[in-house]
């Protein structure tokens, strides 16, 4: 079986990407590193996101304007939908994610990249950074009602993030394999991804 240099795993918040990535890492004997979007975010000082990783972000200020702010985009009376607005400090960080993953791969470390493609620029960054590498792209989907139920149950996410990302993250790149965590168990999702690797020419 020809294992890829990078598993590029993309999906909305609360879709089960991290569970899938850790499951893949456990199931594959090769020494894959799991690197996540959130891992990079948490490298920054908390003042730049002030609880944007929690159920309620704190007040916006000059620092969050440079970092990340969770903006409600839905109209009054509609289900809450929230999107992230990245300032210049976080935009530099976001633009550095894929090149950092490339550096790990070039150092001999295959990577399972747990990503959230908020916009087209993030996809283009991956496309450029991973040029010449063997990449298997994995889309992680889930019905919106299940995403939102998970989001509420977790209690560590801004409510509305799942809805805000669900219709966005899958619009930027094609996938080699897609798994629906609303209908498949974590083990079945891992098996589907490994089967996609095995089926490649």
Which functions belong to the PLM regions below?
Residues 9:
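Hydrophobic anchor at the beta1->P-loop junction of P-loop NTPases
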Residues 101-111, 116-155:
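ATP-dependent NMP and nucleoside kinases share a basic, alpha-helical "lid"
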Residues 15:
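ATP-binding Walker
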Residues 2-6, 108-109:
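Pre-Walker A (Motif I) flank of P-loop NTPase domains
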Residues 144, 149-192, 199-201:
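Small-molecule kinase domains that catalyze NTP-dependent phosphoryl transfer to phosphate-bearing small molecules
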Residues 18:
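Walker A/P-loop
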Residues 12:
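P-loop (Walker A) phosphate-binding loop of NTP-binding proteins
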Residues 25-92:
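Conserved substrate/cofactor phosphate-moiety recognition/catalytic segment
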């Amino acid at each position: 079986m020809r294992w890829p240099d990078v598993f590029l795993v993309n999906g909305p918040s609360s879709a089960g990407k991290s569970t899938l990535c850790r499951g893949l890492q456990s199931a594959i004997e090769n020494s894959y590193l799991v690197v996540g979007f959130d891992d990079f975010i948490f490298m920054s000082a908390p003042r730049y996101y002030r609880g944007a990783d929690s159920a309620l972000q704190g007040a916006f200020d000059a620092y969050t304007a440079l970092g990340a702010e969770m903006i409600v985009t839905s109209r009054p009376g509609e289900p809450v939908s929230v999107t992230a607005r990245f300032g210049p400090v976080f935009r530099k960080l976001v633009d550095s994610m894929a090149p950092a993953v490339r550096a790990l791969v070039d150092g001999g470390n295959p990577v399972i990249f747990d990503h959230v493609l908020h916009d087209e620029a993030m996809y283009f960054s991956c496309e450029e950074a991973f040029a010449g590498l063997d990449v298997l792209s994995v889309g992680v989907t889930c019905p919106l009602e299940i995403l939102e139920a998970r989001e509420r149950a977790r209690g560590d996410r801004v409510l509305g993030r799942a809805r805000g990302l669900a219709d966005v993250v899958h619009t930027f790149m094609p996938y080699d394999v897609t798994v629906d965590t609303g209908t498949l168990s974590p083990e079945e999702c891992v098996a589907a991804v490994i089967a996609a690797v095995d089926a490649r020419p």
